[in-house]
Regions:
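Active-site-adjacent structural elements in enzyme catalytic cores
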Residues: 1-352
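Hydrophobic packing residues within well-ordered alpha-helices of enzyme cores
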Residues: 54, 76-79, 160, 206, ...
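Short, well-ordered alpha-helices that flank and scaffold nucleotide-derived cofactor binding pockets
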Residues: 56, 162, 337, 341, ...
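Short helix-capping segments at alpha-helix termini
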Residues: 61, 267-268, 377-384, 448-452
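A short, structured active-site edge motif that brings together acidic residues
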Residues: 66, 71, 388-393, 456, ...
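S-adenosyl-L-methionine/SAH cofactor-binding core of RNA-modifying enzymes
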Residues: 256-266, 273-277, 409-410, 414-430, ...
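Conserved active-site segments centered on acidic
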Residues: 352-429, 496-502
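Phosphate-binding/catalytic loops
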Residues: 432, 442-502
Length: 502
């Protein structure tokens, strides 16, 4: 089969060419097209023969469900057995967009499309070419990513051509995609909504719209290959480059040292090595190929570049890839989900085993002392020394009287609470430092040149809270009480995270 490639400007659609593409879908053929996430491989979702062609062209296991792409909410009502109220709320908030919802399937959807499941995955893409193609075809379009199964997903038409030329009727070249990782998938068939695949839309965003808890499938990060997949990407090795890939996790200093050690040992074996890094770290690596995902602060860039870089490694014919990890605050879980699958869950953990926590604020007499007292009230799986320090301490002072009153009223002793100046010698390689405010973290890093910045955290940011712990100084006793409650809630999250990592 000869694959026709057409170029379409998404801002100025060529209606004749788009109709040609739509007619191919209607005739049972396959057409690759851009979406806002990755390129999709489309066929008539209600035609079992078209779905079989998709599986065949990709080399995709037939129990791996396909996502049905629609152009109007009424299409969901056509193919779902029932439409949950949660689906209506989420569609109002996020469609068209990178969100796939799993609902019970209606009789119109063949099992060939759902991988034998009684559920169907549905989304409305936010891309003018994709939406126009659905409408012109007169079909609902089943579309997984347009790549050979197991390879990195395509973010530009050239990637599709590399994998699928000669296997499908047409490729619509609409330029590079915007997001670069697949849609979030949420299962709405159970009482509690569950994210089965992380993406650009986070569980927190979903929970806010629904007004209730949204849980995360524990298999998202785990190497679990035993369950029948309810959504794409839950089973089988995914997104993988041809080279063996290993992720190195830990603080920046330890990751760089470990990767360079691995590069040296593999170079001795005559292997061509690539390192996946960031703009901030790329200059520290001595490898044959060093590829940057962009700035670590730019999560969108990291997501957008991931699949392109994995394909670049294939083109450069490297033998081994060592990559930094990318557990960024907002969509880091989605990025790491893809990276772990690409690496076959091969991870080297270089994290230091911390044995001490220092809480730091300004004077050493208030929030940091409350944090110390509260933290000692919790149980850590691995005991740690808990200290409190101030950034500006002229002489030892007892804890603030109002803070003391609040602590005592909550059954926490203040007997040994005296302000102490933070010194560089307090911070060893196995110390975690938590500040109450971003400015305090910056001051510590500026003052102590020899400490690792990755050991110093803003407490609220570390646990995923948006607001910093407010300073109650000068306020009423009630203000100190509110500060205590805020600290306790935040520290409960800290303990949960620390215990999960032990």
């Amino acid at each position: 089969m000869e694959t026709k490639i057409i170029k379409i400007d998404q801002d100025n659609l060529d209606h004749k060419l788009m109709q040609e593409a739509g007619d191919l879908i209607a005739a049972g053929e396959l057409v690759a097209f851009p979406t806002e996430t990755v390129y999709g491989l489309g066929g008539d979702a209600l035609d079992p023969e078209a779905s079989k062609k998709i599986y065949s062209a990709k080399g995709r296991p037939s129990d791996n469900p396909l996502i049905v792409h629609i152009s109007d909410f009424s299409d969901l009502e056509r193919i779902a057995k029932t439409v949950p109220e949660d689906a209506r709320k989420l569609s109002d908030a996020f469609w068209p967009g990178p969100l796939t919802m799993i609902v019970e399937k209606g009789d119109a959807v063949p099992y060939a499309t759902t991988g034998g499941m009684d559920t169907v995955a549905v989304r409305m893409p936010n891309h003018p070419i994709a939406l126009d193609l659905i409408r012109r075809s007169g079909c609902l379009i089943a579309a997984p990513s347009a790549n050979t199964s197991g390879r990195p997903s395509p973010t530009e038409a050239a990637h599709v051509a590399e994998d699928l030329s000669g296997k499908i009727a047409m490729i619509i070249d609409g330029g590079p995609v915007g997001i670069g990782i697949e849609s979030t998938i949420i299962d709405l068939t159970e009482d509690t909504p569950m994210v089965l695949r992380p993406g650009y839309i986070t569980p927190q965003m979903l929970s806010k719209v629904l007004g209730k808890e949204v849980v995360i499938d524990p298999g998202i990060i785990a190497a679990d290959d035993t369950r029948k997949p309810k959504a794409p990407g839950m089973k089988y090795k995914h997104y993988a480059p041809k080279a063996d890939m290993v992720i190195v996790d830990g603080t920046r200093k330890h990751v760089i040292a470990k990767i360079n050690e691995l590069v040296a040992s593999h170079r001795d074996d005559g292997k061509k090595i690539a390192v996946i890094a960031t703009e901030e770290t790329k200059q520290f690596y001595d490898a044959d190929v060093v590829l940057s995902m962009g700035s670590r602060a730019d999560e969108d860039s990291i997501a957008h570049e991931l699949y392109r870089i994995l394909r670049d490694c294939d083109e450069l014919d490297v033998d081994v890839i060592f990559s930094e990890s990318f557990s960024t605050p907002r969509i880091g879980q989605a990025i790491m989900n893809r990276m772990l699958k690409a690496a076959g869950h091969q991870v080297i953990d270089t994290h230091v085993k911390y044995d001490k926590i220092i809480f730091v604020a300004q004077t050493g007499t208030c929030r940091e002392q409350m944090a110390k007292g509260i933290m000692n009230d919790f149980v850590l799986k691995v005991p740690m020394e808990i200290e409190a320090r101030g950034l500006v301490v002229q002489f030892p002072e007892p804890v603030n009287q109002k803070a003391e009153a609040v602590l005592i009223s909550n059954g926490i002793s203040t007997e040994d609470m005296v302000s102490t100046q933070l010194e560089e010698s307090d911070i060893t390689e196995t110390t975690m430092v938590f500040t109450m405010e971003s400015s305090q973290r910056e001051r510590i890093i500026e003052s102590f040149a020899d400490i690792d910045p990755e050991q110093v955290f803003v407490l609220s940011q570390y646990v995923g809270d948006e607001l910093e712990i407010l300073d109650p100084y000068g306020g009423t006793l009630q203000s100190y009480g509110l500060c205590y409650e805020s600290l306790r809630a935040t520290l409960k999250k800290l303990v949960k995270r620390l215990n999960a990592n032990t």
